[in-house]
Amino acid sequence: MRLLLAGCEYAGTTTLAHAIDDWMFEKMGARYSLIHEHWKIPHTSGHPDDTTPDEQAWLLRATPKFMEMHQRHSLYYHVQANTFNGPDGMVVGGHIDDAVYGPMYFGYGGKGQPHDRELVAHQVERTILHFTNDTVIVHVTADTDVIRKRMKDDPHENGIIKEADIDKVKTRFEELVAWSLLGKKIEVDNSGVISDTMAQFEQKIESYLTDTDRSRITTHMMLARQQRWREEGGPPWRRHRGRRDDHSDH
């Protein structure tokens, strides 16, 4: 299952990514080898980000030219051929995060600037489509008041967005999801508890599950059932037959 999660900071993309990973393990018996989330400057390293406060401060002092290059090279790296060797991939933000935050907060990638991020986004997506058309964009939304409360209750270290910009950022994500060449898209509202969001996800992703996904779901269900039968002393019809045989002996 190949997913790109995109949405305003504090909408809950990271939380949802890990919930989907757990759901995939429950349903398919498989997990994502890595969850790639490297595009919210200065959190651009590791799985998850492992940069120190000093390293983050250094990156925040970098020039727009350096930030642009740093992020663009990361985007290109994450769509190289071996990325698509297996059936699964999870990206949080990716080129959509970069196209929102680069021009809005870091001074690069806007219209008329070198490496306009709308154009770079399509370059990245054409590369993805060269290898697979299975990628699904999951547009993660949340009410503005909810995002505002999350910002106050649990602020991110070196977070990006400003409270006054929440609606503008949300609108830009909506525009760029619509702009995307990746044709498979769903939207989930993560304003409430994650279990409700996952219920939306499970319903909406169903039509985009690949043959591999469906095969793994079926196989995992069969294996889980067999394990349950072993623990219970066999399948129900054998247990029932055994009880009848015991009764006939008397």
Give residue ranges: language-model regions.
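Hydrophobic anchor at the beta1->P-loop junction of P-loop NTPases
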Residues: L5
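P-loop (Walker A) phosphate-binding loop of NTP-binding proteins
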Residues: C8
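Conserved glycine(s) of the Walker
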Residues: A11-G12
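Conserved substrate/cofactor phosphate-moiety recognition/catalytic segment
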Residues: H18-A81, Y101-M104
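Conserved nucleotide-binding/hydrolysis micro-motifs of P-loop NTPases
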Residues: W39-I41, H95-D97, T141-I147, V193-I194
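Glycine-rich phosphate-binding loop used to anchor ATP phosphates in small-molecule kinases
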Residues: W58-T132
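A glycine- and Lys/Arg-enriched "phosphate-lid" helix/loop adjacent to the NTP-binding pocket
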Residues: Y101-L176
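NTP-dependent small-molecule kinase module
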Residues: D153-H250
